[in-house]
Amino acid sequence: MFMHRQVSRVWSVAGGIIACALVVGAVACPVTLGGQAPARPASLDQILTELSTYDGGIASDAVWRLRDYVNARKDDAAGRAECEEKILRFMTSPATPVAKTIAARHLRVIAGDSAVPALQSMLADERSADMALYALRQIPGGVADGALIQAMATATGATRVAVIAALGERRTASAVPGIASMLTQPALATVAAIALGRIGGSEAGASLAASYAAAPAGLKPVIASSMLACAETALAAKDSASALRLYETLSPDASLPIPVRKAAVIGRISASGTGAGGVLLSDLSAPDTQEAAISKIADVFGPDDIHQVLTFMPRLSDRGKVQLLAVLSSYPGDRVVPAVMQTLASPSDAVRIAALKALGSVGGPAAVRPLADAASRARGGEQAAARTALGALKGRAVDEEIVTQLAQRPPEAVAGELLLAVGDRRIFPAKPVVSAALMSPSSKVRVQALKALRAIGTPSDIPAVLDLLLDRGDQSDRVDAEKTTVALAQKIENADGRSRTVKTRLAGEKRTDARVRLIGLLPLIADSSALPVLRALAADGDADVVDAAVRAMAAWPTPAAREDVVRLARDTRDQTHRLLAIGGLVRIIGLDKYRDPQAAVADLKRASDFSSRPEEQKLVLGALAQFPCAAALDLANKLLREPAVKAEAQAAIDKISARLSKEVIRK
C-alpha cells in the first residue's frame, strides 16, 4: 500500500511538470492539429482576387471578408488609403460586374477626395459609370461636386441624367447655372427641374420661374412643384420676398393640378406678411381659391378681425360655407354666432348640418331654441346633428334656458326635443317642468318626459309615473311608463324595498285593469319581497288578477320564484297556467349554467313529471342539453318513447351525447 501511494505521487508530480512544459511550448511555438501553424489573415489583394470571379452565387465568403476588412480599417487613415487605392484599381480590372458593384459599395464608405480623379475618369466609360457614380455621389465636399459638374457637361444619355440627379440630391448650389441651362432641353428638362427644386435657394428658384411661362404643358407641373420646394426653402430661411415671387407666379395659373395650385395659394398668403389678410380676402372672392384661403383663416385673422371674413359667407359656395363653418367653431361665440345662425336657413343639407355642428361648439343660451326647432323639423343626419349640438352647448345658462323654454309650453315637437336634451344633459333642476309635462295632452310629450325622468328622476317620482300608467296615459304611454317605473325603482339601494311603492298602490287598488298593470311591474322590478303578494293574488277571486299573478311568477327573472312555479306546475288545473309555470321553471333552472348537472336534471325531471302535454315536455327537452350527464340521457331516452315528442327527444340525445364526447376527449 505504501509503495502504491509513493508511485502515485511520483506520477502526479511528473504529470504536472509535463503539463507545464506543454503550456510553455505552446506559447513559444503555437501549433495546430497536425503540427501546422495557423493560417495568416488574408490580404486585401487575396480577397479581391477571390472576389473578382464572384457572380452572385451562394459561395460568397469573399464578399463577407471584404466587408470585414474594410470595416476594420475605415477609421484608420492608412487603412482607408490602402483600401481606396486597391479597390479603385479593382474597379478597372476584368472582374465581374457583380464583384465591382460590391466593391463600389465599400468604396463609398472609405473614399475621399483622393479617389475623385479615378472615379471621374470611370464616369466617361459607360461600363463603369454607374459604379463610379454610386461611390462618387457619397463623397462629401467641393472636389466631388466639381467632378460631377464637369461630368454633367461631358456625359451623355442615362449617365448624364444620373449625374444631374446626383447633383440635386447633393444640393450642389454651384451646379445651378449648368442645370438651369438644361431646362430647355426636352430630354433633360424634367430631371433638371427636379434637381433645381432639391437644391433650392433664390438662384434655383429664379431659374425655374424664368422658364415657367414658356415651358410645355406637360413640364409645367414639374417646374411648379420644384418652385414650391424652393419657396418653402426660402420661407424657412426668412426670405419671404423670394418665396412670395415664386408663389405669385404660380397661384394665378388655373391650369395647374388642384393640389399644386392650392399649395401656391396657401404659400402666397403665408409669405405676404402684414398683407396676408388682404390677399386672403381676395382669394375668398374667387371660387377656385376659396378652399385654400379658408384653410389659412385661423392663422391670419384673430377674434377681433374675423368679422372681415364673415361678410364673405353669403358669397361662398356651399362647399366653402361648410369649410368656413368648421373654422368658425374655434372662435369665441359672441364674434361668430350670428353668422352661423344665418346659415341654418340654407337650402343645402350639408351647410345646415355644418352650421348645427358649429353651434354646438360656439353657441350659448340663444342657440337653444333654434337647435330645438331644427331637431323637431329635421330627420336623419340633420336631426342627429341638431340633437348632438343641443347636448354639447356649454354652461349652466344653457340648462336654465332649456328649462325656461319648456316652461313656456312650446309646440309638442319642440317640447319633445327639449325634454330629450334634459335627459342627455342630466338637468336635475328641470324635474318640476318634466313632471308637469307628464300631464301634457300630447302623448309624444308625455313619452319624452318619461324618458327624461329615467335620467333625472328619483324613486319619489314613482307615484306620478304610476298615475300616468293607471289613470291618464293611453296605450302608447304605458310601455314607457313601465320602463320609467322600473328605472326609478332600480335607484333604490335596498333591493328588497324597490317594489314598496307598487305594492302599496296595489293593496289599495280596486280596479281590475289597474291591478293587472301593477302586477305586471313586479317581475320587472324583481324585488323578491313581492313574491308573497303574488302568492296571495294567485288565490284571488278575480280571474284576471289570478292570471296576472301566475304570469308574473312564471316570468320572474331570478331563482327566488323556483318553489312558487314548482307549486303552480304541480297544483294548477289550468292548462295554460301549467304550461306557463313549467316554462318558468325550466327557464329558472337554466339560469345557472354552471350548476351541478345531476341536480339540474333532477329539477327538470320534476318539471317533466308535472307535464301532461307534449308542449310541456318539449320545454323540458329543450333545456336538457344544457346539463350533459348520464341522468340527462336517461330522461331523454325515457321521453323518446313518447311519439309526440320523439323528434325533440332524439335531438336532445344527440346534443347531450356530443357534449359528453367532447368532455371525454378533453379529459
Describe the role of every protein-language-model region:
Residues 1-11:
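N-terminal secretory signal peptides that target proteins for export/translocation
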Residues 14-30:
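Bacterial N-terminal signal peptides
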Residues 29-38:
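Basic/polar N-terminal segments that are highly enriched at the extreme N-terminus
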Residues 37-57:
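N-terminal "cap/leader" segments of large eukaryotic alpha-helical scaffolds
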Residues 242-249, 278-281, 309, 402-406, ...:
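Alpha-helical repeat scaffolds
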